[in-house]
Amino acid sequence: MTKENVGLSIYFDNRMLRILLLGAISGFPWVIIGSALSLWLKDFELSRSTIGWAGLIFGVYAVNFLWAPLIDRIKIPFLTDKIGHRKSWIISLQLIILCSLIFWSFLNPVNNLEVIIFLGLLIAISSASQDITIDALRIEQISANEKAAMAAGASIAVVGWWTGYKIGGMLTLFVADYLEVVGFVNYWQLTFIFLCLLILLFNVGLLFIPEDTSNDRQKAQKKDQENFKAAGFSAWFISTIISPLISFFKKNGVTISFLIIGFISV
């Protein structure tokens, strides 16, 4: 058993930098569907009720746990074998966000509001889904017996989230304001292209984060399926939905588990 780091020195562990990056990747999409989308619609003098309806897309974050077991189970062709299960999902979902931003850059809110809101919903679903794998990858960075490091990692993840949100928001507003001042009419559309570049940088950094590529999770799922082989569809449901939930509650305890679920749903 390795000796745990104590005091402030634990925050200078290289793993904390990885967790900080993961937190920033998680928080950044909120800049897009929160700040950028609302201000974009406001600049076109759309009604407050319209902007309010656009805010409903955040509701997907409250229910992302419903498809968490599926994300844990389904592999991304080619990518999973090359870079790992967690990172392949994050990069795939980031690609959806990036493509949605590119589509936004060709649209006008006055004429294409429904399409813009749909793409915003797609970004929100991708963001909520990637949070599942980001949390899993973050937890894998620290051994289960390193309690102090685990607690420090949780706090750094929050700092990373706010860093991605605040710095991302600051850069977004700065770029949009600058482009407007120099005379670009489509300054928001060009700003979305700039955000695509930030997403690419995030993903380059993500590739340097190590991932546990052991097959323990797959072996456990296969064992569950074998135990319930005669049950047909029930086997898939139990190994994909029930077993991960049972494991989650066993690992964290009932109280902590419900607190985590409640925090995610806020």
Predicted stretch roles:
Residues 50-77, 97:
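Central cavity-lining transmembrane alpha-helices of secondary-active solute carriers
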Residues 76-77, 88-111:
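C-terminal ends and interior cores of transmembrane alpha-helices
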Residues 1-13, 99, 105-117, 129, ...:
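Intracellular loop-helix junctions on the cytosolic face of multi-pass helical membrane proteins
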Residues 40-44, 73-74, 132, 137-146, ...:
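Helix-to-coil boundary motifs at intracellular loop junctions of multi-pass secondary transporters
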Residues 2-61, 122, 254-261, 266:
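Helix-loop boundary and gating motifs at the non-cytosolic
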Residues 20, 52-55, 80, 84-87, ...:
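Conserved glycine-rich helix-kink/hinge and helix-boundary motifs of the Major Facilitator Superfamily
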